[in-house]
Structure formats: structure tokens, C-alpha cells
Design a protein with these regions (language model features):
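Conserved phosphate-binding/catalytic region of the ribokinase-like
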Residues: 56, 106-215
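Ribokinase/PfkB-type carbohydrate-kinase core domain
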Residues: 3-139, 202, 209-215
Length: 215
């Protein structure tokens, strides 16, 4: 549910409350190329096993990404010092990162995670995104702004999908960032989180027509 810049989520937990590592087919870790984990605070079983899951992925050469998303109870009890070294790309937004690290500014929050990350991409809404590499290199990229936003529901997830789609194809992190900015922008051209995405050709056509994007 979304109004202006406020939103509320209503979720039926279902299996998310009980699903854990024991429910995952071990073959996933030998067949997968990349594993993306999202909304970890809403998945208590997987959260408990998160480090073990990530170690299994790492042992099998599987790259990983994590978008914590919002903690509905706002406890933010994730052991990021031990989790982040096992994550290939950490993908929070600024608000979530400040909440996770219990810091008031984004610079302070980045300082907290810097010793532990491999790579991080921080989503900044209408300001774009900030890429931080393991060596400390930063790359700020402006957003592709939509002057006629329908809504922003799912824009962060859409950014993730674009970034990861390029990442698994071996693109540079900067190219992944650019593609993520594009898919996040395209998301805002239609209502809901997935309506704007029918097929790759249409997404790139809309991106070119609306934002001048050329791959």
C-alpha cells in the first residue's frame, strides 16, 4: 500500500516462519550460479541458518547477494560483521543501512560495514546509487529520473534484478550499477512492482525512449 512517499506492507508469513536450511535441496548449491537473499528479517528460519547457507554457497563457488530490506519489528539483529564477508554484493538502501548499523548518517553507516564488505551497492532513491568496492573505491551514479512517476513500489527490487542480471553475465560492477539504475527507473513507469517488466526487449525499449538508455 502506497501513498505519496509513505507505504505499508501487509504480509502473510506462511512458510517463511518455518523454512530453514533443512528444507533446501543441497543440489541448489552445486547447480546455482548465484543466490540472492532478500527480506531476511521476515524469514526467521533462514535467518538463523544464514551463515551456514552462505558458507555452503561459497564452498561451491556460488556468488551471493543480500538485500536485508526493512525489519518489521525494527530490532535489526543481524550479525553483519560475520554475514557480510560471506556476501559477494550487499544491496541495502540508505535508510535500511543506517537502521542496521544504528547510525544517524550514511557516512557513519558505511564506516561500520567497510571492514566487512566485499562489494556493496547502496540504493539512494532519486539520487541514484553508490557502489563501494572491497578496496574502498566508490562510484556514485545519478538516477535516471522519471518525470511522470506512476509509483515506486518494487523499485529497489527492480534495481537488484537489473544489477544481478548483469553480474551473472560477467559485467563490470559499474555496468551492473548502471543497469540496476535503469531497471529501477523503468519500474516507476507502471503501477506495482512488476507491471513494467514484460520482456527484456520491452524493458530496454522503454529505457531508451524514456531515459535515453543504450546498453
Amino acid at each position: 500500500m502506497s501513498y505519496d512517499e509513505d507505504r505499508a506492507n501487509l504480509t502473510y508469513q506462511g512458510a517463511m516462519d518455518v523454512m530453514s536450511l533443512k528444507d533446501i535441496n543441497p543440489e541448489v548449491f552445486t547447480h546455482a550460479k548465484h543466490i540472492h537473499i532478500s527480506s531476511i528479517f521476515m524469514q526467521s528460519g533462514l535467518k538463523k541458518d544464514l551463515i551456514e547457507i552462505l558458507k555452503l554457497a561459497q564452498a561451491n563457488g556460488v556468488t551471493t547477494s543480500l538485500d536485508t530490506q526493512w525489519d518489521p519489528v525494527e530490532e535489526w539483529d543481524l550479525d553483519y560483521a560475520n554475514v557480510l564477508p560471506l556476501i559477494t554484493v550487499f544491496m541495502p538502501n540508505e535508510t535500511e543501512l543506517k537502521a542496521l548499523t544504528h547510525k544517524d548518517t550514511i557516512d557513519e553507516a558505511i564506516e561500520c560495514i567497510a571492514p566487512y564488505i566485499n562489494n556493496a551497492i547502496i540504493k539512494q532513491g532519486s539520487r541514484g546509487s553508490l557502489l563501494i568496492k572491497k578496496d574502498g573505491t566508490r562510484h556514485q551514479m545519478a538516477a535516471m529520473l522519471n518525470e511522470n512517476v506512476v509509483d515506486c513500489i518494487g523499485a529497489g527490487d527492480s534495481f537488484n534484478s537489473g544489477f544481478i542480471a548483469q553480474f551473472v553475465q560477467g559485467a563490470t560492477l559499474e555496468d551492473c550499477q548502471r543497469y540496476g539504475n535503469m531497471t529501477g527507473a523503468v519500474n516507476t513507469t507502471a503501477a506495482g512492482g512488476t507491471t513494467a517488466f514484460t520482456c527484456l526487449e520491452d524493458v530496454e525499449r522503454v529505457a531508451k525512449e524514456r531515459f535515453g538508455f543504450v546498453k
